[in-house]
Amino acid sequence: MEIKKVVVIGSGTMGSGIAAHLCNANIPVTLLDLKTEISKQARDKIHKSRPPLLLDKSKINNIKVGNILDNFDEVKEADWVVEAVVERIDIKHDIYKKIFKERKKGAIVSSNTSSIPIKILSQHLSEEEKKDFCITHFFNPVRYMGLLEIVKNENNDLDKINSL
């Protein structure tokens, strides 16, 4: 599977770091948060960061910003949706419910969690949804760590997950 477009939900340290990393790989990213202003501030921090998060400052144009109320339809066009929100299972479950309702068929959905087991994250997902769900734990700072931990579940489509 080729990843051509990504949506990152949550524009904190990890979400913005993931967005910048994908941007460096020339993958267009939409960065969503509760308010568009929060996503804009995150994009500004990416642009001004020291040490730089971007290989080339012009790549910032590959990051589109928005909010989860007005711009959630961006999920429909994404090949991969990364959840990078606060470590609260109730919030994560609510977001997954919305993502799986809106995503295009076959799009990968992942969590950047480092502390919640995949069985808990995926407990409300259907067997079909679990095929496309995994944990993609990026390490901070994303650009410099060069490490991605992928935690799969027993239902994963391995060819798809291996494309990450």
Feature map (PLM): residue ranges:
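Structural motif
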Residues: 9, 17, 66, 84, ...
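Conserved structured core elements
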Residues: 8, 12, 16, 93, ...
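General small-molecule cofactor/ligand-binding pocket signal
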Residues: 30, 64-66, 134
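Rossmann-like NAD(P)-binding element
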Residues: 34-41, 52-109, 115-120, 147-148
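Rossmann-fold dinucleotide-binding core
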Residues: 107-164
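Short, flexible turn/loop "capping" segments at secondary-structure junctions
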Residues: 23-24, 75, 141-145
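Short, glycine/charged-enriched secondary-structure capping and boundary segments
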Residues: 21-24, 44-46, 94-98, 122-127, ...
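NAD(P)+-binding Rossmann beta1-loop-alpha1 motif at the extreme N-terminus of oxidoreductases
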Residues: 1-48, 102
